[in-house]
Amino acid sequence: MGQLALQRLQPLASLPRRPPSLPPPSSATPSLPCATASRRPRFYVARAMSSHIVGYPRIGPKRELKFALESFWDGKTNVDDLQNVAANLRKSIWKHMAHAGIKYIPSNTFSYYDQMLDTTAMLGAVPSRYGWESGEIGFDVYFSMARGNASAHAMEMTKWFDTNYHYIVPELGPDVNFSYASHKAVVEFKEAKALGIDTVPVLIGPMTYLLLSKPAKGVEKSFCLLSLIDKILPVYKEVLADLKSAGARWIQFDEPILVMDLDTSQLQAFSDAYSHMESSLAGLNVLIATYFADVPAEAYKTLMSLKCVTGFGFDLVRGLETLDLIKMNFPRGKLLFAGVVDGRNIWANDLSASLKTLQTLEDIVGKEKVVVSTSCSLLHTAVDLVNEMKLDKELKSWLAFAAQKVVEVNALAKSFSGAKDEALFSSNSMRQASRRSSPRVTNAAVQQDVDAVKKSDHHRSTEVSVRLQAQQKKLNLPALPTTTIGSFPQTTDLRRIRREFKAKKISEVDYVQTIKEEYEKVIKLQEELGIDVLVHGEAERNDMVEFFGEQLSGFAFTSNGWVQSYGSRCVKPPIIYGDITRPKAMTVFWSSMAQKMTQRPMKGMLTGPVTILNWSFVRNDQPRHETCFQIALAIKDEVEDLEKAGVTVIQIDEAALREGLPLRKSEQKFYLDWAVHAFRITNSGVQDSTQIHTHMCYSNFNDIIHSIIDMDADVITIENSRSDEKLLSVFHEGVKYGAGIGPGVYDIHSPRIPSTEEIAERINKMLAVLDSKVLWVNPDCGLKTRNYSEVKSALSNMVAAAKLIRSQLNKS
């Protein structure tokens, strides 16, 4: 593996009480004063070997934060217990970076739930329904905003740009009274300083915060969020003053919104905001970090014109065109934080290739002005490869998790400054060559099949209206049919049984019997509740992607490769390292078993190719769409086998379709074309009477509704309840949707139980724009994370609401 792979995040218990000090980031020179008419700006002079990390995973190497949060929420532990776990995690992270030699170490990137929610707390922008009026925001209000409580629903949650991380969407309006209500940033800076580590506090920038917010309920949807800029900047100024008083010498503003297609007025507002903060930034070195894509030319020009900025950070993994802009114009004396180590994947960096990029930058801005960095926060990758004891040695040698990427950054910085570790670079080159030449990566037959697929189109043989008639004749469903999305609660006993079977501690016969009994319980419950189209509850599945990946070639799985999705929710993305095939049927045995337990329709449950792709760590040696088509062909075989086995309703989840949408509009059509094509490949060969469902999560679908229609599913269920029926506005505007559709009627991510009346009101809102012949009634998402008490109550109210509205329709 070489020296690089042996670097790891220290175990919490092994940390010394008094860590060695790290020289402060700006100890070499005085802080950068703001340019004024009477003073010439003095620019920070970086030493060679400068390195920087945008951000780091907060969950812990073995999900320590997840378990601490859930224990606290369940009342099993107290505030002190939770805060102690968090403090130990922060300490281990900062020390790992310090020991690795990182110069610019971030602070305030830790969060108990979400960094956007932290910013909402910092600004005191708490919606009135949570009952907060003033003072420091505590955990009760903080977690109520994230998760809801008995009397107030949670704030909306949606995808963070095109990642699988979710943020809590701020709710803003003209009457919000902003105030400095959370001192987290300065508290954590002081905490690191007490350990002898001088950090760079990180704040989400004011533009990104506002443009990722939404108008609060009751506020006109046309309300200009940027009109609040003058109201939030005073709070930012207070925070900056607080940090300076605490001894901060650097500040990092994360402004990823700059990679979006911003208009002239938005860019002007950005420029004005930072100009307005100039006096408050005096005495600080300022870094503005962008990531996830190229910075458009006009945004780049605006960024480069800012005064009082010491350095600019760019994603040079996904933002290759930004390199051309840097070549044309980069201001003299400024630092370039070059994001050459991928923060969103798990592949070991090609150190020689990255070094060439850095040398190109050296010719443009000068060696002393280049800082080696990650492309974005390492929040989006797994924590530490050292914890993977079961991965085979060859595959493991191709990988680098967050802890290893920190070492890669410093290795590049050392090499760039003339202190190249020849042994490490040689080992890295050998591992890169091993991956390129390994026979396990390429399957010629699969490559040929994909080439054939790309040359053809795939459509069902008849229109959806004709198919729905054939399906209704077979299924005989009532108006407003009820269903659930797929999963039912995963109990501790169920998880234990799966673990024991995987470890070969119980026999296959005993395992199958246990799953069968779980199916019987779930099916009986649904029949008693009166649900129309059933699911078997997915008791045999640990994860909707991992379950399929484990049965497909070209996939590998980690033991501790967890990544935060939201709050305490973590996912363990599979690794797609090679060409993909389906050796045998994956779900037919289980779906056939479940169907025999009921006379009602039973959904066969599959995960779609785009979602498997977007929720995996994907190979980076071929275009993503080619990998997606390989998965689609495997799912196609499974769909056709399910149909042959007598399964008449098949759900192909595309929960992550939209999150793969490129951030730049110019790139979106190509993605949507191949993503829709991949979905159609999976089911274009089934009979008219076989009903194809799909499900989508956490997305703003308004701008891709025509692509959703083009998917040609018979029924689509959509996560909608936290979005104030934003989706329904599409239909208000006249978009015609002839297939079945089920916008979620209640939020499964909150423990709150909606009343029958509340759900009925939602259904009536939907019927104002959707025909009762196409409307389905269902929860937002799968029920895996809820307990049975919550599920029974919520589903009972959902079915009662559907029956209530159904009876009203029959009378009219």
From Swiss-Prot:
Residues given in the record as 5-methyltetrahydropteroyltri-L-glutamate binding sites: K66, N164, D543, Y566, R569, C570, W615
Binding-site residues, Zn(2+) 1: H695, C697, E719, C781
Pathway, per record: Amino-acid biosynthesis; L-methionine biosynthesis via de novo pathway; L-methionine from L-homocysteine (MetE route): step 1/1
InterPro entries with a match to the protein in the record: Cbl-indep_Met_Synth_N, Cobalamin-indep_Met_synthase, Met_Synth_C/arc, UROD/MetE-like_sf
Tissue spec. comment: Expressed in seeds.
Source taxon at top rank: Eukaryota
Annotated keywords: Amino-acid biosynthesis, Chloroplast, Metal-binding, Methionine biosynthesis, Methyltransferase, Plastid, Transferase, Transit peptide, Zinc
Positions that bind L-homocysteine: I485, G486, S487, E538, D653
Protein family (similarity comment): Belongs to the vitamin-B12 independent methionine synthase family.
Name of this protein: 5-methyltetrahydropteroyltriglutamate--homocysteine methyltransferase 3, chloroplastic
